[in-house]
Amino acid sequence: IVYDKLNNNLPSFVETNTYFINSPHTVNVISIAGDQVDNLLNGNQIKPIGSFEIFDSEGVLIDEATGEFNEHGNDSWAYQQRGFDYITRDQHGYNYAIKDDLFREKNREEYQRLIVKAAANDNYPFTGGSPAHIRDSYIQSLSQVGNLRLDERSHESCVLYVNGDYWGVYDY
């Protein structure tokens, strides 16, 4: 290893990897990591840079990229599971997009932005309990299957890991 005494080192690529050991899943898995990503999800409204990996339910890597995370949603920020936007930035030198057919109802093959949310609309009007967190995605799916041609959002369920810690079931 060589170090520059004048500290003129060029920034290098950062490699992140997620490993699942005795952690089977039945839905896709999103793993995000970064120095400040958990601070964002703990309620600090910052825009950290971090890595994004998405795996299928068998644990096989679909794609990975580096980009920016920021707050998404209103109601979800009143709860511990918070939604966020992920924006792939090719300026970081890794990928310009997540390249895969991520949604069953769409034929699009790459995405520069994904919304990852905890279905907080099911918590309205803050009544407590343990809602199923499927109302919003269910209605969106009915609209697509029924070909209603409404302004709708595709969704898939996933499990989220943040810096290696399990954060729960989310939608993207």
What are these regions (language model features)?
Residues 1-172:
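Phosphate-handling architecture centered on phosphoinositide signaling
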